[in-house]
Amino acid sequence: MEKKILEQLEFEKVKEQFWPYLQTEQGQLELDLLEPIANKDKIQAYFTELEEMAAIFVEHHHFALGGLSDVSESMQRLDLEADLSIQELLVIKKLLQVSAEVCRFYADLENVDLVALKALFEKIESFPSLQGSLQAINDAGFVEGFASPELESIRRQISNKEHASRQLLQDILKKQAAYLSESLIASRNGRSVLPVKNTYRHKVAGVVHDMSASGSTVYIEPRALVSLNEELTQLQADERHEIGRILHELSEQLRPHSRSLRNNAWLLGHLDLVRAKYLYMQAKQATVPVISDDKSLQLLNARHPLIQNPVANDLHFANDLAVIVITGPNTGGKTIMLKTLGLAQVMAQSGLPILADKGSRVAVFNGIYADIGDEQSIEQSLSTFSSHMTHIVEILNQADSDSLILFDELGAGTDPQEGASLAMAILEQLRLTNIKTMATTHYPELKAYGIETAYVENASMAFDNVSLKPTYRFMQGVPGRSNAFDIARRLGLAEHIVKEAQAMTATDHDVNRIIEQLEQQTLESRKRLEHIKEVEQDNLKFNRAVKKLYNEFSHAKDKELEKAALEAREIVDIALAESDSILSQLHEKAELKPHEIIEAKHRLKQLAPEQSLSQNKVLKQAKKWRAPRVGDDIIVTAYGQRGTLLAQLKDKRWEAQVGLIKLTLKEDEFSLVKLKEEAQQPKKRAVKVVKKAATGKGPRARLDLRGKRYEEAMQELDAFIDQALLNNMSQVDIIHGIGTGVIREAVGKYLRRNKHVKSFGYAPQNAGGSGCTIANLG
């Protein structure tokens, strides 16, 4: 990318706007080196990083890295086998700390899908061992005593010597107070001294280290203290030597990791720059543009980043459009619009967000060229025109169909007629070679060129005829018009002079009137578009409000369901605790009578919550599938028994075989059940209670008492009913025959007395009639 375009667009000033959002020197360095690139995939990767950083901030509003200084020079010193200073080690200590914090942050990161940033986060290494070693230096740069046993020992000796020195001085201070100018202990040349009056200097034996400016006081180190101070000085030298050894040891530990540390610093700096881009985007209401597959551009509400309170403008540069010519008078904002396009494109190709609305689109150009401003060269004795033309020639020689060219006041600085002709010829050459170009000019001849030439479009900047000031609103498709007559009239020029001037340029006046009508139509269209945008924004806000209400409702519903589930779990827990208590009571007894086990099982059954089968949604749904037919399997709603439909009677009544009993049922008294679905239902967990039985016989659903004596029949009946209850049988058959009726009556009396028998009756005629009793248990 040509360096001159960056200077003309003041790209460095734009980059300076990102400085307040940076936290690391490495990020600052990367920003300083940032320039536009022409690699579409690389630019898209930058944008993906930025979008993912936005996703991180949705979940973590205060994501930060902490201040980091540049470590590149320190790493070079490590590579050269040099030892690092305390300050350099502190910088690396901070780097290790931030690296560890970022690693932990990424490990805990949830609800954010990362692709581009994932690679960055996962490359950052943590060094807990090095981090632990560098704790020997605190944040103030003091090497802690625990850094080595030797340092700790030396400092303990220094402390003892200093204490002894102070004690000795205090004693001398008391004894020779009359000779002192002040009752205090001073320090000179790192030695503890006493301020002695000059007239008594020979009264205090010792070494003179200094004298006051007036000469009235001399600072003497008492002789008794000299040897003690010598020892202290030696210990302090030993301390410095030991600290140097510790710094060398720490440097040696860091040396093998210099490459990884340098890489960590770069990764953190890059993350910092991505973070700064996001914060800038939020603060400036910028956006990440879409990259076109062709050379088309679309800027929605684009703003110039270096202007305070800039006017936002739309720009549509279709793929087949080669040239846009902005015509009209000076000071209308033509150059600002030119630079707005250039900066948006340069920023985007540098991976930066642009000051425009969402939906904006940019292209990728191999070269962006501009001729903007007064380039007069005094040194080369070139006029403004010559300077511009020299630069234009260079641009034309370098540009191709993958270039974007920006011309400000093309053809200016020479004869207007010749300048206009040159401008048209240059634009025509660029149009024929399909090079995207935007040019500003005040030559009226170029308006006609823009109207008559294919793939060339006129544009202008709106002007307020009332205030006589430019509005800086970009009007694409409308050529600029002169406002000289209107301005002159409003400033007080005589009307007859204005009319005479208009008569001299009658044709131009007609053109201006047409242009004025186009301007009005454009402004009206823009107002309608702005109204549509306002409606869209209102709809968007409404949709967000509805979505928020829906989310709140869903959240409340989930909370209620969670509460209900919690209550259900509490009920189940209570039931399980009660069942465990019952089972514990059963297991505490070595021998249990059958009726005790039956009673316990009955209590366990009562723990289960009652459910009305008539309200069972699954069964209701099954019933709705189709009308019942003969042979269908059913469940009797009243007591949950399985049966089969035998025949359809009148009034929607059915005859059903339920066990050994035939029943007459209404259609709302049973539900259809599919065998396939029944097979797929999960089996219920059951608690098995094992009874010590006298025999090894299994459970029986039928008891035959024919030919039995009364006592024998009653014993077998009692054992049979107990066994049936233990095995959860709901229905049993008792065959007693007709005979004399003694056994039949005895069976009836027994069943009436047994509280676990719900009901009983004779079997149907085809199943034994009065010779067989069917008992329902529960």
Curated annotation (Swiss-Prot):
GO biological process: mismatch repair; negative regulation of DNA recombination; rescue of stalled ribosome
EC number: 3.1.-.-, 3.6.4.-
Entry binding sites for ATP: G328, P329, N330, T331, G332, G333, K334, T335
Entries under SMART domains matching the protein: MUTSac (SM00534), MUTSd (SM00533), SMR (SM00463)
Matching InterPro entries: DNA_mismatch_repair_MutS_C, DNA_mismatch_repair_MutS_core, DNA_mismatch_repair_MutS_sf, MSSS, MutS, MutS2, P-loop_NTPase, Smr_dom
Enzyme class, first EC level, given as a word: hydrolase
Gene Ontology MF: a single term: endonuclease activity
Key words of the record: ATP-binding, DNA-binding, Endonuclease, Hydrolase, Nuclease, Nucleotide-binding, RNA-binding, rRNA-binding
Limits of the Smr domain: 703-778
PROSITE patterns tied to this protein: DNA_MISMATCH_REPAIR_2 (PS00486), SMR (PS50828)
UniProt entry tagged with the keyword RNA-binding: yes
One family name in Pfam for this protein: MutS_V
Protein family according to the UniProt entry: Belongs to the DNA mismatch repair MutS family. MutS2 subfamily.
PANTHER family (UniProt xref): OS10G0509000 PROTEIN, OS10G0509000 PROTEIN-RELATED
Function: Endonuclease that is involved in the suppression of homologous recombination and thus may have a key role in the control of bacterial genetic diversity. Acts as a ribosome collision sensor, splitting the ribosome into its 2 subunits. Detects stalled/collided 70S ribosomes which it binds and splits by an ATP-hydrolysis driven conformational change. Acts upstream of the ribosome quality control system (RQC), a ribosome-associated complex that mediates the extraction of incompletely synthesized nascent chains from stalled ribosomes and their subsequent degradation. Probably generates substrates for RQC.
Quaternary state and interactors: Homodimer. Binds to stalled ribosomes, contacting rRNA.
Record's protein name: Endonuclease MutS2
Species of origin: Streptococcus equi subsp. zooepidemicus (strain H70)
